[in-house]
Amino acid sequence: MSKSLGPVCKLCRREGEKLFLKGDRCFTSKCSFEKRDFAPGQHGRLASRGGGRNRGRESDFARQLRAKQRARRVYGVLERQFRRYYEVSLKRRGLTGLNLLQILESRLDNVIYRLGFASSRAQARLLVTHGHFTVNGRRTDVPSMLLKDGDEIAIREGSRSLPYFKELDTFAESRTTPEWLNRDIKKMVGVVQRLPERIEIDGSLNEQLIVEYYSRR
């Protein structure tokens, strides 16, 4: 499945709820979902009547597919890579669904977003691609890099003088850091302390439906 290059706000409307893909804009009146909370397309309003997107008619497969697509869109992951994460989660000990969510949460772009160093995962990916971050002292430009306990993420010394990073401390202080991460705003450094527990991950994600989707294929 190819990458969606259209307006990301349509993805929220397709899911029938905010996915917070555009950072701070999603919390303002400028959010497209606030103005048009129905599905995109010619028949979007009709499909949305009767509560949300008329999910009562959905088959089990449709619900499983929707759960998988929602997770993909939240984390900005392509289908091939998402499937690879699922296969890795199968080989790990424990619950496959939780393993999958932990893999997604441990991506570098997501960790940067969770630390408050970016307003969205998309922005975090862009910052990483431009080489503004280091992991354990080494510069990286791979947003999909999977982090582990003890890994240190820092803003590259040469990037700290840029206007965006000069004003970052004010923005970062307004964001709550999850307990599985440790952040030092003054030093512009974050550390992965452990993998997140299920309660610390987006509760609207349904990992069981995702597992069921791939299990039947």
Where is each model-derived feature located?
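Ferredoxin-like alpha/beta domains used as RNA- or RNAP-binding modules
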Residues: 1-115, 139-217
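Internal active-site segments that recognize and position negatively charged phosphoryl groups
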Residues: 114, 118-123
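Short, well-ordered loop/turn sites that connect or cap secondary structure elements
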Residues: 121, 127-128, 147
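Glycine- and Gly-Pro-enriched alpha-helical subdomains that act as flexible
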Residues: 131-135, 139-141
